[in-house]
Amino acid sequence: MPWGRRPTWLLLAFLLVFLKISILSVTAWQTGNCQPGPLERSERSGTCAGPAPFLVFSQGKSISRIDPDGTNHQQLVVDAGISADMDIHYKKERLYWVDVERQVLLRVFLNGTGLEKVCNVERKVSGLAIDWIDDEVLWVDQQNGVITVTDMTGKNSRVLLSSLKHPSNIAVDPIERLMFWSSEVTGSLHRAHLKGVDVKTLLETGGISVLTLDVLDKRLFWVQDSGEGSHAYIHSCDYEGGSVRLIRHQARHSLSSMAFFGDRIFYSVLKSKAIWIANKHTGKDTVRINLHPSFVTPGKLMVVHPRAQPRTEDAAKDPDPELLKQRGRPCRFGLCERDPKSHSSACAEGYTLSRDRKYCEDVNECATQNHGCTLGCENTPGSYHCTCPTGFVLLPDGKQCHELVSCPGNVSKCSHGCVLTSDGPRCICPAGSVLGRDGKTCTGCSSPDNGGCSQICLPLRPGSWECDCFPGYDLQSDRKSCAASGPQPLLLFANSQDIRHMHFDGTDYKVLLSRQMGMVFALDYDPVESKIYFAQTALKWIERANMDGSQRERLITEGVDTLEGLALDWIGRRIYWTDSGKSVVGGSDLSGKHHRIIIQERISRPRGIAVHPRARRLFWTDVGMSPRIESASLQGSDRVLIASSNLLEPSGITIDYLTDTLYWCDTKRSVIEMANLDGSKRRRLIQNDVGHPFSLAVFEDHLWVSDWAIPSVIRVNKRTGQNRVRLQGSMLKPSSLVVVHPLAKPGADPCLYRNGGCEHICQESLGTARCLCREGFVKAWDGKMCLPQDYPILSGENADLSKEVTSLSNSTQAEVPDDDGTESSTLVAEIMVSGMNYEDDCGPGGCGSHARCVSDGETAECQCLKGFARDGNLCSDIDECVLARSDCPSTSSRCINTEGGYVCRCSEGYEGDGISCFDIDECQRGAHNCGENAACTNTEGGYNCTCAGRPSSPGLSCPDSTAPSLLGEDGHHLDRNSYPGCPSSYDGYCLNGGVCMHIESLDSYTCNCVIGYSGDRCQTRDLRWWELRHAGYGQKHDIMVVAVCMVALVLLLVLGMWGTYYYRTRKQLSNPPKNPCDEPSGSVSSSGPNSSSGAAVASCPQPWFVVLEKHQDPKNGSLPADGTNGAVVDAGLSPSLQLGSVHLTSWRQKPHIDGMGTGQSCWIPPSSDRGPQEIEGNSHLPSYRPVGPEKLHSLQSANGSCHERAPDLPRQTEPVQ
């Protein structure tokens, strides 16, 4: 072949292979992904239409239905008798069962209506099956050994097979035209054609109790007793009896029923009183649905879904109504339906076939007597509606108009309004709504129930409407509820000592993060980078990690205390938190570098927090002295009080971003409330049904609440509070509920982070990244990379593409190895159905909040959770720190006990992850206070400073060293981020001035951070260097402050003493105390002139004497003279004043001076401590000087006439003031 033609052939081969793979991919998608497991919501993919599956099961004498997620639980038949077996016909929406007590075959519609008898049956019926293609019912008569078949009405019954040995447990596959049954006596499995021919024995085994088919995998499953009487195992084989396999399951004891659908197995266990769901290949991913009443074991179990009963006939024989509606466009306004008898098109109701029989045209119903309307009729395409003039109202029958006369006092308690008619009060509804079944409440687009629509209600005509959904949501089969398209949502939550997630139906229940968690009560999810942000309450920091638990990174380690709430702004790219220890609301960018306080005034104990990025507002709860719910802008301004009345401890808070509705829970009142974002239209949603609520989350039609009273997660309808379902499973304290789904946080753009993973072009579409390629390229198989158009498609890695898209149901069922023993593989979610009291196999009340009930179907016991030990009948926390069971290094950390675990807090000089502690290299990080030019040497838990080979004191500089310069040859500063040791691709790798270096021994790159920063990329601000650097200055400053304080204190003491002395002196002068020498008699014995002074001194304190001084009189020339011992006496006395005229009185009396006399004498008064002071302050004497007894002789020598005598005064005189 010429080389020029080869590109043409290559292109043709490329197109053929591409077409083949595309067809294979589509087929695999339709046969694989469109084979939804019972918990796979196929409508989310947008490609597989169909209703969600539900379960039908017998329980005692009743038959009920329930969704796999535990919702919509209701009884279809109250009294079904003793049912031997049952089956359904999905297309005809019928349920058939045998009442062996009444010996009849009965049927009812799947909604529980239309109960009727089909035919009589034998008493020993042991199995029932329905051929949904030929519309026939088959049952097994074990006593007579026959298999009987009849039509759906029971009129044409006939024996299909006879002479069988105790047949039981029949199952059919109408597509393959085969039926299967078992024999109890021989323990064998048999097969035959549905016509009753080609009977074949497949296997001979023992103890077959349950038999069922997986029509999608074309395999036969049965339960076989082990022979030991306590265990039963699930076996399977193909339709030929080959490829027998044993299926491993966690609970496989005494199975009473089982059913398969997709990759799931549904089964019930005797004495377990529950329905179990698990992966049919591995037995893992288990969910338990506890039923109500819980004391009756479920019997027969079936999955109701169109793919559980697939059909093969063509559209002409059995047309698909949905397909015909899509093909009915040539009928113009009407939707055409195919008449199976005439094979001609018939118009839908409200339309008629045109005369040329080519299209459908509208019928004008109002043209014929207003079609029953009393006062007015309006025609609409395909229908009509009655109208009323002003002043009249349309009655609930939709045809009669009545004059608007209001009822007095609304006696009928109508939800909207009441009109008085001749027949009495009648409730009326606004335009667009109709009266409900109770005759009082209204439903419709103008009513509070929004017409039953979960999102959008579209009025069609008065009394008629239809539901629609927001972009990204799909309308479900009930034509009312909406479900998010895309991946199945995950519920992410903190569990005190770990972080977990599960699907809404309890599947995929796993632990994401468990190591070194301490205590976690606050977390949130970033849909842009797909990361989890969470707060470590015990270790007092904020971390983030990937959704798979990898790449944990500490963001904020300083400035936070008791973190209880966390919220992420996925549009503004910031995080916010509540800190009850510091009584603040804080915020930061996602790197944790720039964090600040948002709210710190008028706030007590903030707990829950939520952010509305589009409204640019924060909402938080406060559980302090004045409980309240508040709102503010993202900067902390414009604070608004949302609610403050009827609150005790408002804890969790969340926002419904589709309806702008605020939800919060009150822990102490056990109440869930809702309101608008401004606090208006506040109403109570749930009360006393949620135990101890802590946090909330809302998505689709559901509101999720975490309960600490019974550690679990509760789901209710977000508008009504009904359909309560409780999910639990080895939980401790579930909190911070977060829904992970692209639509859970509207407006998120994953293309902002690493281009959404796309190589070329990224387009955001409903929260997901859509990758496109530039011209000349095509997308690779991963949907993200782009390849040239001429890239060889038949490469080795793409040759096995068919294996990658093969349906899971077609994979082999080899024996699955045992569990790996990890905690994530043993988690079992348990669904508690609404309306039932909490009870499990371990008895009423369960095992408490710190234990779980473990049942094997026969027996049950309580097992304490990890970190707890049995203490009597309860499980108590193990204090690993006190019992020395922790792994905390004693030399570098301190153990802190937490509920169910512990954490290690590193000592100064170390850092760690909550378990291990590592030495900090202060020298490399620059977190030291060695003086300028001094050398720093790292040590374990610290560092040393040296200066030219000798130790240097911290903070001092070395004089002979020169600091390395950061200047280049041109005199400019070097760029630290372009260090020669790193390639250009690392430009910008080191942050905050860090220098990138290449370590040859490790062949890796690292950052040398400047002083004040630390971390792998110098991303963490570290202020410890400042404290260390200024420690010496701080000590000097402290000494100086102490010295100044001491001096000031001494001065204050001196001033105090002087003030005290001055005050006491003044007080003594004004109020003299009593003389202790005064006797009560008042007499003082006097001595004669010859008495010595020693006698007087012996009886009283030393006396005081006064010598008068006369001022010098220049005229008389008198001059003072000194006496002995310094005493001063008058050498010359004035004629007008003689010495004898002065009497020295007692200290209580004023000095007394007589006139001149011949008898000169001196009186020595009793001594007193205040004698001289009293005399000194007396103004009667011109001058004086106090002297002691030693100077008395000197005085007497100068005045020889002086002698002692007692005073004889008529009265006492008060001291001179």
UniProtKB/Swiss-Prot annotation:
LDL-receptor class B repeats lie at residues 93-134, 135-176, 177-219, 489-529, 530-572, 573-615, 616-659, 660-702. InterPro entries: 6-blade_b-propeller_TolB-like (IPR011042), Cueball_EGF_LRP_Nidogen (IPR050778), EGF-like_Ca-bd_dom (IPR001881), EGF-like_dom (IPR000742), EGF-type_Asp/Asn_hydroxyl_site (IPR000152), EGF_Ca-bd_CS (IPR018097), Growth_fac_rcpt_cys_sf (IPR009030), LDLR_classB_rpt (IPR000033). Residues 327-361, 362-402, 403-443, 441-483, 747-787, 838-876, 877-918, 919-959, 978-1019 form the EGF-like domain. One of its GO terms (biological process) is branching morphogenesis of an epithelial tube. The keyword Transmembrane helix applies. One of its GO terms (cellular component) is plasma membrane. GO terms for molecular function: calcium ion binding; epidermal growth factor receptor binding; growth factor activity; guanyl-nucleotide exchange factor activity; receptor ligand activity; transmembrane receptor protein tyrosine kinase activator activity. Residues 1-28 form the signal peptide. EGF stimulates the growth of various epidermal and epithelial tissues in vivo and in vitro and of some fibroblasts in cell culture. Magnesiotropic hormone that stimulates magnesium reabsorption in the renal distal convoluted tubule via engagement of EGFR and activation of the magnesium channel TRPM6. Interacts with EGFR and promotes EGFR dimerization. Interacts with RHBDF1; may retain EGF in the endoplasmic reticulum and regulates its degradation through the endoplasmic reticulum-associated degradation (ERAD). Interacts with RHBDF2. This is Pro-epidermal growth factor. It comes from Mus musculus (Mouse). The gene is Egf.
